[in-house]
């Protein structure tokens, strides 16, 4: 299965609410910031944004004072799982990032998708990739 298939079929899928809602954007990146696959509308990282996200996995709490930035948009960092999951909120939407052995799985949501639905979609794929040593 190609990495793009994981994004298209496992991240940009129906979130399971029975109403056909899905994430606004999703991507899988290598730990070095290389794009493995992404939805067409996934925002592009600027400057040190990706490096700062990776630093927060290594030093949990690093992003809390400044926020998480993606393409210049600021997300307030909310409770995640230190070293494993970063969650952010921006207005009625937000972001979930799950770190695996070799990659980071990103999901961005907007209403009516809920934070919990985004977490479930992103973390389910992330857990699968961890089981596959990816």
Curated annotation (Swiss-Prot):
Keywords linked to the UniProt accession: Actin-binding, Cytoplasm, Cytoskeleton
Stretch forming the signal peptide: none
Primary location recorded for the protein, binned into one broad class: cytoplasm
GO MF, one annotated term: actin binding
Top-level taxon: Eukaryota
Record localization: Cytoplasm, Cytoskeleton
Gene3D superfamilies reported in the protein's UniProt record: Dynein light chain 2a, cytoplasmic (3.30.450.30)
This protein's record includes keyword Cytoplasm: yes
Subunit structure, as described in the record: Occurs in many kinds of cells as a complex with monomeric actin in a 1:1 ratio.
PANTHER family on file: PROFILIN (PTHR11604:SF41)
Protein's name in the database: Profilin
